[in-house]
């Protein structure tokens, strides 16, 4: 990593922070660790790391400060240790930057095929797309590791073997700060308002995502072009419409001589140089319900085609993909009523896409509202029979739902019970909160687990 014999401060001692400290120590650096919480410091001390408060103990002789993704470094208020690093001229990086530096310095002379990295970013669909890429590669017999926001931390993966593909899911928190971003293939799924306070607005949010493409210049880029930001990004990356480095992905019809993958009415189609190269029916794939998952499938398809896989191999792998927990996860069918957990739909765009995947919906929503308002949901709510609102501020959230029929429930147990009592055979009780979970839960996973637990009570 280039820090042999040098001091590096690691700020934040959760999973990624401790992994960074271990990797730095193994690479010959002196890792100095700090966390504002006593528990984090205790974990680091138990592993033999030096505890070093960068404010109290200073930054003299420090070559770099490595921070965890959850710690603000710019907006809304940067952590004081990062401010001190800026003032002292100390570079600030994160585990993603360390990973790419380490990979770039690797000796792959004994590999017939050096490892390749696929990095996936975007507002929604990152996890499903990343997991689906890894699943397809595994089914095809290609060695693969899944890391980043999904799977293991990037510094916890095994040393890559010959021909292996490393698939990394990256959030805007990670792409914004990493000092090295050099994937072989980069994916941009879509963009919608999220994390705006952290990035100083929509422009800053998009700029954070865009760094994945502008910093390292990936050999291939798979870009969702349904939004103007994706169209702009695609236009910035190529020399002309026939530039084979770009694969455009859309839920609508695309034209031109380039390399395109589109999903319309449940069919995935690949076009190259204006001619159709493949067509796959996604309508009966149980692990990929709805138009939003078809877009995820198109992104994964584009990556795997760029890696040399045949369409029939990808199609066969689609059929065996089981989906991810808390993302359009079918939990149960009780008396003809379906229960679906999409707790990961933490913003308006994700919830809108979830609502578009089902016919008659009993919609459980609410939580910690994000910037941007909820008005965009109104048009997507045509299939909603009633909304069942949860959250500490459920009354206020309900006021933003317009004319959608609603029942202010407050907690998950009440919402599931009332939705179940109202539901008719053929209905779907859908948890798609359109909000963060932190008012009542410590994560969207915990919220989804509560939904599942309440449904299991109905079954028993």
UniProtKB/Swiss-Prot annotation:
Principal localisation: cytoplasm
One term of GO molecular function: UDP-N-acetylmuramoylalanine-D-glutamate ligase activity
Keyword Glycoprotein annotated: no
UniProt entry tagged with the keyword ATP-binding: yes
Keyword entries, A-Z: ATP-binding, Cell cycle, Cell division, Cell shape, Cell wall biogenesis/degradation, Cytoplasm, Ligase, Nucleotide-binding, Peptidoglycan synthesis
Main EC class the enzyme belongs to: ligase
Compartment list: Cytoplasm
Catalyzed reactions: UDP-N-acetyl-alpha-D-muramoyl-L-alanine + D-glutamate + ATP = UDP-N-acetyl-alpha-D-muramoyl-L-alanyl-D-glutamate + ADP + phosphate + H(+)
UniProt name for this protein: UDP-N-acetylmuramoylalanine--D-glutamate ligase
Gene source species: Jannaschia sp. (strain CCS1)
């Amino acid at each position: 990593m280039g820090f042999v014999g040098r001091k590096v401060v690691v700020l934040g001692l959760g999973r990624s922070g401790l992994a960074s400290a271990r990797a730095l120590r193994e690479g010959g650096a002196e890792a100095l660790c700090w966390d504002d919480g006593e528990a984090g410091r205790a974990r680091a001390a138990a592993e033999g790391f030096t505890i070093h408060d960068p404010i109290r103990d200073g930054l003299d002789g420090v070559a770099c400060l490595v921070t965890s993704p959850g710690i603000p470094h710019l907006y809304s208020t940067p952590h004081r240790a990062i401010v001190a690093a800026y003032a002292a001229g100390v570079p600030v990086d994160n585990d993603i930057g360390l990973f790419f530096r380490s990979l770039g310095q690797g000796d792959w002379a004994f590999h017939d095929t050096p490892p390749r990295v696929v990095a996936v970013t975007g507002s929604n669909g990152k996890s499903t797309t990343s997991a689906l890429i890894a699943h397809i590669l595994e089914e095809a017999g290609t060695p693969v590791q899944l890391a980043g926001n999904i799977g293991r931390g990037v510094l916890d993966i095994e040393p890559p073997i010959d021909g292996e593909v490393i698939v990394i899911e990256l959030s805007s928190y990670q792409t914004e700060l990493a000092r090295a971003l050099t994937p072989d293939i980069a994916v941009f799924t879509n963009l919608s308002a999220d994390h705006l306070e952290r990035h100083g607005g929509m422009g800053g949010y998009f700029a954070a995502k865009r760094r994945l493409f502008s910093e390292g210049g990936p050999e291939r880029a798979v870009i969702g072009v349904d939004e103007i930001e994706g169209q702009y990004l695609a236009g910035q990356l190529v020399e002309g419409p026939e530039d084979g480095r770009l694969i455009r992905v859309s839920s609508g019809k695309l034209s031109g001589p380039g390399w395109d993958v589109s999903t319309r009415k449940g069919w995935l189609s690949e076009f190259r140089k204006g001619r159709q190269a493949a067509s796959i029916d996604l309508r009966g794939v149980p692990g990929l319900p709805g138009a939003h998952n078809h877009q995820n499938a198109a992104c994964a398809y584009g990556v795997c085609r760029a890696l040399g896989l045949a369409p029939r191999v990808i199609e066969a792998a689609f059929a065996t993909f089981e989906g991810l927990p808390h993302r359009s996860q079918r939990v149960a069918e009780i008396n003809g009523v379906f229960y679906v957990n999409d707790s990961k739909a933490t913003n308006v765009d994700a919830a809108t896409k979830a609502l578009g995947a089902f016919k008659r919906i009993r919609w459980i929503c609410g939580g910690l509202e994000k910037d941007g308002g909820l008005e965009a949901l109104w048009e997507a709510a045509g299939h909603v029979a009633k909304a069942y609102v949860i959250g500490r501020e459920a009354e206020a959230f309900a006021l933003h739902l317009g004319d959608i029929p609603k029942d202010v429930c407050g907690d998950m147990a009440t919402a599931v019970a009332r939705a179940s009592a109202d539901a008719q055979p053929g209905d779907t009780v859908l948890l798609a909160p359109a909000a963060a979970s932190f008012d009542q839960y410590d994560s969207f996973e915990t919220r989804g687990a509560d939904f599942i637990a309440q449904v299991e009570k109905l079954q028993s």
